[in-house]
């Protein structure tokens, strides 16, 4: 145990350890009862919870909160009281964000320009660590684990949470090497395995048929829509659990946009997707849930159908109807 722990923290730590121990016993008993049923989904959730509570119970540092013990495992992310400032606290960009983002759903982030959508989505895989003058408070949990804790290294987080940017970002390499480079940088060296993953990733991004005969030609020779699908292929090559998409079709023509939207419908079968979009029509076409941001705050979150047909917040309605923007 670490030194210089105040008595109140130590007392809380011991109390929580007792609670975790009892919770493990309770969950193990529930697991035994479930083993005689066909409820496999619930059994998976119980196993996940047991695993997390055991990690919590073994934690020997009362001053570090690595996991969220009441995490809802229907969510891929849970955000608690998250704030972010730019320019050494000169600009308060995100204000008291509390939000749960569901697994295996497409969640659209909508709102006026400058409302915090892109700032928020880049927070989910710690892109702001690369920006000077940024400060943060609050917590972001990914599958119960605090993304800023020592137990979730930055490189591991970014392999699990892929990112696709507004404009296609191919490397100045061949189509093949655009994907292989990411694999090699994460320690995958076997050429047969790399070849397999490159093919699977391009197929997953609906690009294989377009490029299978030109794999070793420059990626810059592809059309804008093909380059964006290559960016998606590169993101899914590492088998992430989440895809973050920051206005992925804003630089594309309608035909290429339609192909990306069709691809999103396919990808959500395997990944949780968070997409920033300025297109209300696109949000309705591709998303299951919608979050409305306004002036750095989340004003409303619900199913996409509810947000677009019966919004609870007057500003949400004004934005959807085009009265604010």
Curated annotation (Swiss-Prot):
CDD domains, sorted: ABC_PstB_phosphate_transporter
BP GO annotations: phosphate ion transmembrane transport
Binding site for ATP: 111-118
InterPro entries cross-referenced by the UniProt entry: AAA+_ATPase (IPR003593), ABC_transporter-like_ATP-bd (IPR003439), ABC_transporter-like_CS (IPR017871), P-loop_NTPase (IPR027417), PstB-like (IPR005670)
Gene Ontology MF: a single term: ATP hydrolysis activity
Compartments reported by the entry: Cell membrane
Reactions mediated catalytically: phosphate(out) + ATP + H2O = ADP + 2 phosphate(in) + H(+)
Recorded topology in the membrane: Peripheral membrane protein
Protein's UniProt keywords contain Plastid: no
Subunit-level organization: The complex is composed of two ATP-binding proteins (PstB), two transmembrane proteins (PstC and PstA) and a solute-binding protein (PstS).
NCBIfam families: 3a0107s01c2 (TIGR00972)
PANTHER family xrefs: ABC TRANSPORTER I FAMILY MEMBER 17
Full protein name: Phosphate import ATP-binding protein PstB
């Amino acid at each position: 145990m670490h030194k210089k722990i105040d008595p109140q923290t130590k007392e809380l730590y011991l109390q929580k350890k007792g609670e975790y121990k009892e919770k493990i016993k309770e969950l193990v008993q529930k697991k035994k009862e479930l083993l005689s049923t066909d409820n496999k989904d619930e059994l998976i959730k119980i196993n996940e919870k047991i695993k997390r509570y055991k990690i919590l119970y073994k934690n020997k540092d009362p001053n570090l909160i690595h996991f969220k013990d009441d995490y809802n495992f229907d969510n891929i992310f849970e955000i608690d009281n998250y704030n972010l400032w730019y320019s050494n606290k000169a600009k308060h960009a995100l204000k008291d964000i509390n939000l749960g983002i569901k697994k295996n759903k497409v969640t659209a982030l909508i709102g006026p320009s400058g409302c915090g959508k892109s700032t928020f989505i880049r927070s989910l895989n710690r892109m702001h660590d690369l920006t000077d003058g940024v400060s943060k408070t609050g917590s972001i949990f990914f599958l119960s684990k605090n993304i800023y804790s020592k137990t979730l290294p930055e490189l591991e987080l970014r392999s699990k949470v892929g990112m696709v940017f507004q404009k296609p970002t191919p490397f100045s390499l061949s189509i093949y090497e655009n994907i292989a480079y990411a694999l090699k940088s994460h320690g995958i060296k076997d050429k047969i395995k790399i070849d397999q993953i490159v093919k699977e990733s391009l197929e997953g991004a609906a690009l294989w048929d377009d490029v299978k005969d030109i794999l070793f030609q420059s990626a810059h020779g592809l059309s804008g829509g093909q380059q964006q699908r290559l960016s998606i292929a590169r993101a899914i090559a590492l088998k992430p659990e989440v895809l973050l998409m920051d206005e992925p079709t804003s630089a594309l023509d309608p035909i290429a946009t339609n192909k990306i939207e069709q691809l999103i419908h396919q990808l959500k079968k395997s990944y949780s997707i968070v997409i920033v979009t300025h297109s209300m029509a696109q949000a309705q076409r591709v998303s299951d849930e919608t979050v409305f941001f306004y002036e750095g705050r989340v004003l409303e979150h619900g199913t996409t159908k509810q947000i677009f047909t019966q919004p609870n917040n007057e500003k949400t309605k004004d934005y959807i109807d085009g009265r604010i923007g």
